[in-house]
From Swiss-Prot:
InterPro entries: FBPase_C_dom (IPR044015), FBPase_class-1 (IPR000146), FBPase_N (IPR033391), FBPtase (IPR028343), Fructose_bisphosphatase_AS (IPR020548). Mg(2+) 2 binds at E98, D119, L121. It is found in: Cell junction; Cytoplasm; Nucleus; Cytoplasm, Myofibril, Sarcomere, Z line. Binds 3 Mg(2+) ions per subunit. The modification Phosphotyrosine is found at Y216, Y219. Pathway: Carbohydrate biosynthesis; gluconeogenesis. Induction: By retinoic acid. This is Fructose-1,6-bisphosphatase isozyme 2. The gene is Fbp2.
Amino acid sequence: MTDRSPFETDMLTLTRYVMEKGRQAKGTGELTQLLNSMLTAIKAISSAVRKAGLANLYGISGSVNVTGDEVKKLDVLSNSLVINMLQSSYSTCVLVSEENKEAVITAQERRGKYVVCFDPLDGSSNIDCLASIGTIFAIYRKTTEDEPSEKDALQPGRNIVAAGYALYGSATLVALSTGQGVDLFMLDPALGEFVLVEKDVRIKKKGKIFSLNEGYAKYFDAATAEYVQKKKFPEDGSEPYGARYVGSMVADVHRTLVYGGIFMYPANQKSPNGKLRLLYECNPVAYIIEQAGGMATTGTQPVLDVKPESIHQRVPLILGSPEDVQEYLSCVQRNQAGR
């Protein structure tokens, strides 16, 4: 093992990575501008999250967002940061946010060709107890010549140009894919830059962890109940799966990516259409997981194949290691056949 200097002289920062990808694609530079603006917003949100207690940013703002969640002060700040940074990149035309009832249309003089769907601060109900939270985003090209409208955002996840998430935990991390695998970058606070820490991440074929909110067991359908029972009490005498659930989707998904296993937010009696939003929660993480060799399904079809009908549409989400997700789908098929 060779000695390494504590100071890297040829580090691959995320800014450099994005520029290199743009050069390789012989693009116009708009996507590069867009991604760099998104990264600036993420750095600002990371700083705000770490200062939240000192800056009086804990607590609720007194309103409820379009999907029925209480809006936290940090939600409002993060949403404004992302919108302002993306619009000032001169590369977007339509923005869809969890916090806005309608799509945000970029002013004509600032318009570009990209549509961005994002959740500025996922897991914000965990802010006050200092649990990990995150930012999620997916980028699409506008496919029509018409005036920009929210219809431009109603594209299946297969059309994603780039997607990723930021995780604000013990460190700030970005997972990013531009369609050629998944790379992980860690924020170096001394440099103020994201630095590559893992290239072409691959999820395990099979894991040892299942993740879902068992508090809703009363409402589980037969397939979900059967699958969870199999993980807790294996019929073949093998070791049971470990149970892990943070309640912040980015944290749960990232753990699943790193350690393998399965993350589940299936449909149930209480939420027959699922609870997570397709455009800015499910599609981005499904894209990341698939790019890493995993699977993401609604239980009836791949998440990325769903054709959205509205910008805040909800769908069930089951993702993770391919063998684990396939086992869940076998439970679904078996229960459907038995009806």
